Amino acid sequence: MAGGAFVSEGGGGGRSYEGGVTAFVIMTCIVAAMGGLLFGYDLGISGGVTSMEEFLTKFFPQVESQMKKAKHDTAYCKFDNQMLQLFTSSLYLAALVASFMASVITRKHGRKVSMFIGGLAFLIGALFNAFAVNVSMLIIGRLLLGVGVGFANQSTPVYLSEMAPAKIRGALNIGFQMAITIGILVANLINYGTSKMAQHGWRVSLGLAAVPAVVMVIGSFILPDTPNSMLERGKNEEAKQMLKKIRGADNVDHEFQDLIDAVEAAKKVENPWKNIMESKYRPALIFCSAIPFFQQITGINVIMFYAPVLFKTLGFGDDAALMSAVITGVVNMLSTFVSIYAVDRYGRRLLFLEGGIQMFICQLLVGSFIGARFGTSGTGTLTPATADWILAFICVYVAGFAWSWGPLGWLVPSEICPLEIRPAGQAINVSVNMFFTFLIGQFFLTMLCHMKFGLFYFFASMVAIMTVFIYFLLPETKGVPIEEMGRVWKQHWFWKKYIPEDAIIGGHDDNNTN
């Protein structure tokens, strides 16, 4: 490409800049994406630990007792215990609060500082859990883990979106989701192994959460900060040199000027939380709220949190329940590669819509199989064939999520906010995600006890609603530079009424279309 040239790209009217994909930016994004290991490891570890007999005997003897003595005459209510659910869900309540603190630190001190705080809090929380002697220590550890997750999830997707060139931003950003799936799979494998230990297997499972935390802490020292963040803090020359380095080009004037324009606009914003409520930011506000809500209401964390518990509820043995969780973890990780391949080739909308249809069908089928075997009484049994079918459809469901709502739930909110509201937008994204993750974690086992197999129909109906929402209201953002999202909203049939002309930056583009 000739020096200084830029061309229009499909998928929303944005343009690409000079420079290509460098080994430096790929390595940087890989290290940063390890922040997803924090989230993924915890998602995978808690369900396996809460199904371990030694753990239940020590901390939740009433649950272990009701399982052994079969006090409940329904399989649906076998694990229904609020304190047990609080062990899982408390992390996400802390993450919700931490995400708001992280947004301020991310803006004032850079993305790296937030990533460091996240890793350190997660490390301390892992040690609390590994050496816990009572439920209070467990909950304190989980709250510290939540602070780590809140900071990491607020800063890492923003960091990835700002470092990556627009044409591969989707693939590199999905590295965060890939790290989450790797963390889930590793946690499932560790749970399967530690369940064989005579003693303290649960301590090993919880303590090994320190490993991704150490990676995050070390990575935060190694990584450079983003040009966007440097400009926000007045380091213009350093920002330009970093932009040249990550783009592998000497002439980055057009992109650098757009970044400067965005930073100047951001400096005029004294309160991003107030400004994000303005009408011109309405699309970003809606999607930063709706996408994480819908992501959680798919029911995916029913599988991620409680896979071993769910499979034991349905009559799988201890080994079979843990191995089934490993299988879903493998499917989750491998399916994420589909998204990495497809997101910048076929766009975000196609993956959202296909994944939604796939999840809807699978939720209906799983609910129907469970209803046919257990009915409303919950006193039936699973045949091996039925168990295999349920596991198969859960795997297809997980695959649909893993190449659509899983990675895109983090990617799209991180790429649609202009710089002046980006920390606030990402904080909303993370906090809404964490709030509904908390609700699912805290009340799923109770909902299963009361709604029985109908719970899967409930999740299916939510998937149908969110798929229609995406079809009508989300424009394609493939190949659109972050600072040019105003053009995309301005061209959309519904959102254009909220976007004034002066909200579109980059006036030196001759290829603007209406």
Swiss-Prot record:
Disulfide bonds: C77-C449
Pfam families: Sugar_tr
Catalytic activity entry: D-glucose(out) + H(+)(out) = D-glucose(in) + H(+)(in); D-mannose(out) + H(+)(out) = D-mannose(in) + H(+)(in); D-galactose(in) + H(+)(in) = D-galactose(out) + H(+)(out)
Primary location recorded for the protein, binned into one broad class: membrane
Transmembrane intervals: 19-39, 86-106, 113-133, 135-155, 170-190, 204-224, 285-305, 320-340, 350-370, 389-409, 428-448, 453-473
GO cellular component term of the entry, any: plasma membrane
Topological relation to the membrane, as annotated: Multi-pass membrane protein
Induction: Induced under low-glucose conditions in pollen tubes. Down-regulated by glucose.
Keyword Ligase: no
Deleted gene: phenotype: No visible phenotype under normal growth conditions.
Residues in compartment: Cytoplasmic: 1-18, 474-514
Keywords annotated in UniProt: Disulfide bond, Membrane, Sugar transport, Symport, Transmembrane, Transmembrane helix, Transport
Known function: Hexose-H(+) symporter that catalyzes the high-affinity uptake of glucose, galactose and mannose. Proton-coupled symporter responsible for the uptake of glucose from the apoplast into the cells.
Family named by the database record: Belongs to the major facilitator superfamily. Sugar transporter (TC 2.A.1.1) family.
Protein name listed in UniProt: Sugar transport protein 10
Source organism (scientific name): Arabidopsis thaliana (Mouse-ear cress)
This protein's encoding gene: STP10
